[in-house]
C-alpha cells in the first residue's frame, strides 16, 4: 500500500490497496516544470530559520562590539576570559555569548531544513527525514576513512562540505527515491506501520549515507574547494569578480531561488572566512531603495509621472523594507515592467556593491541592512556604495520608462 499525500484523491482497488487519482493537469507537468516549485517550497520554509538565526546573531554582535566596545579582532569568549568585565556588563557579555552560540546553531539548521522540505514537497512526509539527513551531511559531512601505507594505519580526514550544492542534489534525489519506493513496495495493510516507520526510513537513510559519502560530498566539495582556490589565488581581482557575481545573483530575482543560492554561497565563504559578505548585503538593499527613489524623482526629472498610481506608495514601502534588509518590496515594480526594472536594479546593485568592495568596505557578519551596519568596516564607503547603486537604479528606471512612454510602449494609470 502506497502512502499518498493528503492532496491526492484515494479510491480502493480490487485488492484492497489504495490508488491515487492523479490530477490531469499535474500529470502533464514535466520534471523541470515541477522542480522550481519543490525548490521554492524548501526555500520558503528555510527563510524563518535564517531570520531567527540572523537576528539573534545580530543581537550578540551588537551587544559585544557596539555596546560593550570590544575590539573587532577579539572574540566574545576571549573577552569573557579577559577579566575586564564585571557586574551588568559581564551579564550582557554572557547573554551575547549565549545568543552567538544559539544563533549559530539556528544558522546551521538552515540547509538541512531546506533539503528536508524540498524532499517533502517531492515525496511527501516519508521523504522528510531523508532530506533532512542529506542536508545535515552536506554541512557536516562524514569523516573520510583513509589508509596510510607509510604507517600501515587507518585514519580519518575531514572532507570539504558540499553545502548548498549537495543539499539541493540529495534532497531532489531522495525525494524522488522515496516517492518511487512508496509506490513500488506494496505490502498488506497490517504491515503498513512497518513500511512507514521502519522499512522506507531505513532504506532511504542507507541510500543517503552512501550517496553523500561516495558521490555528492566529493563532487560538491570539489566544486566548492575549486571556487575558493580560484578566488583566493586571484586576490583583489578575484574578490571584485566575486562581488559582481554575487551582487548580480542577489539582485536578479529579489529573494527568489537564485538569490537564496547566492546567499548560501556567500554565507559559506563568510563562515569559512574566505571572502566577506559585503557585496551580497549591499545588493539586497539597493533595488528597493533605488526603485523607491525613482518614484520620488521621476516628476522632478521629466515633468511626468512615469509610474502607475498604486506604485507610488509601494515605492515608499519598498524603501522602508530595504532598511530592514527585505528586498521583496521591489517585486511589484519588477512584475509591472520587468524590462525597465530588472536591468536597472541589477546594474545598480553590481556597480554599488563592487565600488564599495573596491574602496575597502568589509562586512563579515552575515546579515543585511540596519542589523549589520554597526559592524561594518569603513561604513562611510559602504553607505556610499548603497547610495551610488540606488541613484543609478533610480535614474536608469526613470529614463527607460520615459523612453518607453514616448514610444507608446508604456501605459501609465495616473489616477
Curated annotation (Swiss-Prot):
Cytoplasmic face of the membrane: 1-46, 123-126, 179-197, 259-276, 340-341, 400-415
Compartment(s) where it occurs, according to its Swiss-Prot or TrEMBL record: Cell inner membrane
Domain PTS EIIC type-2: 35-410
Key word Metal-binding present: no
Cross-referenced Pfam families: PTS_EIIC
Superkingdom in the source lineage: Bacteria
UniProt keyword terms in alphabetical order: Cell inner membrane, Cell membrane, Membrane, Phosphoprotein, Phosphotransferase system, Sugar transport, Transferase, Transmembrane, Transmembrane helix, Transport
Membrane topology: Multi-pass membrane protein
GO cellular component: a single term: plasma membrane
Statement: the UniProt record of this protein carries the keyword Transmembrane helix: yes
Periplasmic compartment residues: 68-101, 148-157, 219-237, 298-318, 363-378
Positions of transmembrane segments: 47-67, 102-122, 127-147, 158-178, 198-218, 238-258, 277-297, 319-339, 342-362, 379-399
GO biological process, one term: phosphoenolpyruvate-dependent sugar phosphotransferase system
Single annotated GO MF: protein-phosphocysteine-sugar phosphotransferase activity
InterPro entries listed in its UniProt record: Bacterial_PTS_Sugar_Transport (IPR050864), PTS_EIIC (IPR003352), PTS_EIIC_2 (IPR013014)
Free-text note on domains in this protein's UniProt record: The EIIC domain forms the PTS system translocation channel and contains the specific substrate-binding site.
Function of the protein: The phosphoenolpyruvate-dependent sugar phosphotransferase system (PTS), a major carbohydrate active -transport system, catalyzes the phosphorylation of incoming sugar substrates concomitant with their translocation across the cell membrane.
Protein name: Fructose-like permease IIC component
Gene field: fryC
Amino acid at each position: 500500500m502506497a502512502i499518498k499525500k493528503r492532496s491526492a484523491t484515494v479510491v480502493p482497488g480490487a485488492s484492497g490497496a489504495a490508488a491515487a487519482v492523479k490530477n490531469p493537469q499535474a500529470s502533464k507537468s514535466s520534471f523541470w516544470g515541477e522542480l522550481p516549485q519543490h525548490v521554492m517550497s524548501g526555500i520558503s520554509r528555510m527563510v524563518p530559520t535564517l531570520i531567527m538565526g540572523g537576528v539573534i546573531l545580530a543581537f550578540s554582535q551588537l551587544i559585544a562590539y557596539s555596546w560593550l566596545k570590544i575590539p573587532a579582532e577579539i572574540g566574545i569568549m576571549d573577552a569573557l576570559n579577559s577579566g575586564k568585565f564585571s557586574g551588568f556588563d559581564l551579564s550582557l557579555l554572557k547573554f551575547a555569548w549565549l545568543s552567538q552560540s544559539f544563533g549559530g546553531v539556528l544558522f546551521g539548521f538552515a540547509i538541512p531544513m531546506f533539503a528536508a522540505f524540498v524532499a517533502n514537497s517531492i515525496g511527501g512526509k516519508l521523504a522528510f527525514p531523508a532530506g533532512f539527513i542529506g542536508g545535515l551531511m552536506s554541512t557536516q559531512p562524514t569523516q573520510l576513512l583513509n589508509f596510510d601505507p607509510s604507517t600501515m594505519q587507518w585514519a580519518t580526514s575531514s572532507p570539504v562540505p558540499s553545502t548548498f550544492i549537495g543539499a539541493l542534489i540529495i534532497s531532489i534525489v531522495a525525494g524522488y527515491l522515496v516517492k518511487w519506493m512508496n509506490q513500488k513496495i506494496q505490502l498488506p495493510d497490517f504491515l503498513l506501520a512497518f513500511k512507514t516507520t521502519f522499512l522506507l526510513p531505513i532504506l532511504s537513510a542507507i541510500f543517503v549515507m552512501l550517496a553523500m559519502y561516495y558521490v555528492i560530498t566529493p563532487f560538491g566539495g570539489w566544486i566548492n574547494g575549486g571556487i575558493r582556490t580560484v578566488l583566493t589565488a586571484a586576490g583583489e581581482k578575484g574578490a571584485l569578480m566575486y562581488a559582481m557575481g554575487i551582487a548580480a545573483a542577489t539582485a536578479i530575482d529579489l529573494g527568489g531561488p537564485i538569490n537564496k543560492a547566492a546567499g548560501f554561497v556567500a554565507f559559506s565563504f563568510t563562515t569559512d572566512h574566505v571572502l566577506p559578505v559585503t557585496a551580497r548585503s549591499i545588493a539586497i538593499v539597493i533595488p528597493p531603495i533605488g526603485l523607491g527613489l525613482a518614484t520620488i524623482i521621476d516628476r522632478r526629472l521629466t515633468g511626468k509621472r512615469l509610474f502607475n498610481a498604486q506604485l507610488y506608495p509601494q515605492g515608499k514601502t519598498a524603501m522602508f523594507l530595504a532598511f530592514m534588509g527585505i528586498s521583496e518590496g521591489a517585486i511589484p515594480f519588477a512584475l509591472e515592467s520587468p524590462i525597465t526594472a530588472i536591468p536597472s536594479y541589477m546594474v545598480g546593485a553590481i556597480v554599488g556593491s563592487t565600488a564599495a568592495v573596491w574602496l575597502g568596505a568589509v562586512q563579515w557578519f552575515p546579515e543585511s541592512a540596519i542589523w549589520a551596519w554597526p559592524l561594518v568596516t569603513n561604513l562611510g564607503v559602504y553607505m556610499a556604495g548603497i547610495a551610488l547603486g540606488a541613484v543609478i537604479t533610480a535614474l536608469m528606471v526613470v529614463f527607460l520608462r520615459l523612453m518607453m512612454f514616448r514610444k507608446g510602449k508604456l501605459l501609465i494609470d495616473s489616477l
